[in-house]
Amino acid sequence: MYYTARHSCCTLQPKPSEFGLLLLPLGVFCMTFTNQITAVATCRTPYKQKFGIPRQPGLVEARGYVELEGHINHLDAVRGIEQYSHLWLLFCFHENLAQGWKTTVRPPRLGGNEKLGVFATRSTFRPNGIGQSVVKLHRVVQRKGKVCLEISGMDLVDGTPIIDIKPYIPFSDSIEGAVGGIAQEAPKL
């Protein structure tokens, strides 16, 4: 499966069949499907290129906003969202899609000296190009005819397509006693 990016949307397209089994190079069978994912919003941030972005959300208190797009651009779509302090943003790594992905990566936290499986990391080079970040919600405003969520703590490049927005719910999203592997503690800034 791969994404093809078209402006503010990502399309998931399996090869070679519409629905069935796909034989992967390693001999693993995988069910395939077709689903088009369209961006519901665009994230506006002070980070104009990927090299200045914090490695994880919440490390820097920079402010930005999520701007609703198209038919989603309606206050009813965010009715009640201000009762939450934080939100999950699901997004497309739109700047990395053309570069593809590898089964193993070298996480910066390990100094680039050790390889881990892509699913054991938060690498931006992922098989389906989907990421998630938790951000602090400050308020809902309207700007130039668009519904906007003012946020902080994001780790996204300006213009990132947002494919879903969900409330952060502390009792289920924060797991007591969870183990963080190589990222047990926040990096030192």
Task: Map each language-model feature to its residues.
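Glycine-rich, low-complexity intrinsically disordered segments
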Residues: G27-V134, H138-L189
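Cysteine-centered motifs
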Residues: C9-C10, C30
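Alpha-helical and His/Cys-centered functional microenvironments
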Residues: T11, S17-E18
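Low-complexity, intrinsically disordered or signal/transmembrane-proximal segments
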Residues: Y2-Y3, H7, Q13
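Short, Lys/Arg-enriched N-terminal segments with co-localized hydrophobic residues
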Residues: E18-C30
